[in-house]
């Protein structure tokens, strides 16, 4: 009888270990899923993000420009948007940097942007940064993420580092209806790389997700002989309501 009970106990322990391992594995794999991006791309009103992030959020939008006659020199625009959940207030700040060929940078200007509602901000007309923001739109306002676009696509590269808590996938595309043409270069007609990156922390503890679109065959197409070569956008928050939807 004792031997029988021992076998039952061992079996129950093994079942428990298997269940725990399976649950952890499923959670591990769920954190490598990017389907949640359908909630954010596109977004037509930044205030919609408050329902996902109860303790504030930030959107970091970066765009880089190459200019004719300045080889190796990059103009970088960084826009940091902050949403305060308690007051439902949204504020933004934009910085203009000159990145030199040796990758050192020179800060040229910092300006405050006034939120107008939706995904719109008042852009100053009399600043150095103004010319780079004439057609400014958030990536989340224009990019339409559809999981089916990537279901059959083979990633160029997968970076998976649980130790540092990060996961990235990079794809190569030549055409895609998902990409709009409002960024100073028509991504839909260019060869480009698109990259998705994220924190592997459970979403209900911490959320950090980045999407980057980088052109590979850019040519200046504007009167200023300037074209965007990179558009990157990160959504970051201390806590989210997405964890229960994994």
Region roles according to the model:
Residues 1-16, 20:
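N-terminal Sec-pathway targeting helices
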Residues 15-66:
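N-terminal leader/targeting segments and the immediate start of mature chains
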Residues 52, 57-98:
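N-terminal Sec/ER secretory leader and immediately downstream segment
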Residues 60-67, 170-179, 212-218:
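Generic short beta-strand segments
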Residues 67-71, 99-103, 176-186, 221:
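Short, cysteine-centered beta-strand-loop-beta hairpins and adjacent loop/turn segments enriched
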Residues 78-135:
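An acidic-aromatic
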Residues 126-208:
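Short helix-loop boundary/capping segments
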Residues 188-193, 198-246:
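Acidic, serine/threonine-rich low-complexity disordered tracts
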């Amino acid at each position: 009888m004792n031997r029988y009970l021992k076998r039952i106990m061992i079996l129950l322990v093994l079942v428990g270990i298997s269940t725990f391992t399976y649950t952890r594995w499923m959670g591990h794999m769920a954190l490598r899923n990017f389907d949640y991006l359908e909630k954010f791309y596109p977004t037509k009103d930044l205030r919609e993000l408050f329902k996902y992030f109860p303790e504030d959020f930030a959107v970091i939008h970066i765009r880089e420009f190459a200019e004719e006659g300045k080889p190796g020199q990059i103009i970088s625009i960084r826009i940091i948007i902050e949403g305060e959940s308690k007051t439902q207030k949204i504020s933004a700040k934009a910085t203009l940097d000159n990145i030199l060929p040796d990758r050192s940078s020179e800060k040229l200007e910092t300006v405050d942007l006034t939120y107008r509602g939706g995904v719109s901000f008042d852009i100053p007309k009399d600043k150095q940064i103004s010319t780079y923001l004439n057609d400014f739109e958030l990536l989340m306002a224009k990019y339409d993420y559809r999981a089916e676009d990537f279901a059959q696509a083979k990633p160029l590269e997968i970076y998976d580092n649980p130790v540092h808590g990060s996961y990235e996938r990079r794809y190569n595309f030549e055409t895609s209806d998902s990409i709009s043409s409002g960024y100073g270069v028509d991504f839909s007609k260019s060869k480009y790389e698109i990259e998705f990156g994220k924190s592997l922390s459970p979403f209900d503890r911490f959320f950090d997700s980045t999407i980057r679109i980088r052109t590979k065959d850019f040519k200046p197409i504007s009167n200023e002989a300037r074209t965007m070569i990179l558009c990157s956008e990160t959504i970051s928050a201390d806590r989210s309501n997405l964890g229960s939807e994994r």
